[in-house]
Amino acid sequence: MAKYYCILFDADNTLLNFDAAENKALTETLVNYGIEPDAETVQTYRTINEELWRQLEKGQIRREKLFGERFSRFLKTIDAAGDGVEMNRFYLEQLSTHPDLMNAEVLDVLRELSEVATLAIVSNGAQMVQTRRLAESGVMNFMEDVFISEKMGCEKPNARIFDAALRALGVENREHVLMVGDSLASDIQGGSNAGLDTCWYNPNHAENPGKVIPT
């Protein structure tokens, strides 16, 4: 008998290859705005973006601030002119067109799991971007529902997004729920905050600093 009757998945870098999609979308955005997408420039953006996402996950800023500031800070850092808000909008549109899967086995694994458990997605991504990427990737063929933080009004690792997802799915016994994701800070900590078992998707065998322990 299966232990888990409900499995919640993160989206980016768990089911969908966000790194590949980001590389494509960022390159397309920089080229569109006349900025050379060399390694140093790309890393400058990523450093700014990652710091803002960490602040978001800690509840220090809201999503609107992240989207409104990341490209504005980037342009200021590289001393380039432009509208950061408009640049962010263009980037999100480009990102939504890249539904790359993490690997060729993703859909087969989801197909098998969907036969024994209810599957759903809990994502911190942007509503428009994630809805399109998930649909075009084929992932949604196996999902009961998808819960995206922008629409839900809270971000992982806040337990409220998991609470709302489980209510919508009609799940009461959390002993039979598993959260799967690549991020210790949002997925594993979030699942733990909600009283769920967790599985750290770690294909690159990164070291766990030990602060957040998956079950």
Named regions from a protein language model:
Residues 1-7, 20, 31, 107, ...:
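Asp-based, Mg2+/Mn2+-dependent phosphohydrolase catalytic module
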Residues 2-11, 15-107:
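N-terminal helical cap/lid subdomain that shapes the substrate entry/recognition surface
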Residues 48, 115-116:
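Structured helix-beta-strand junction loops
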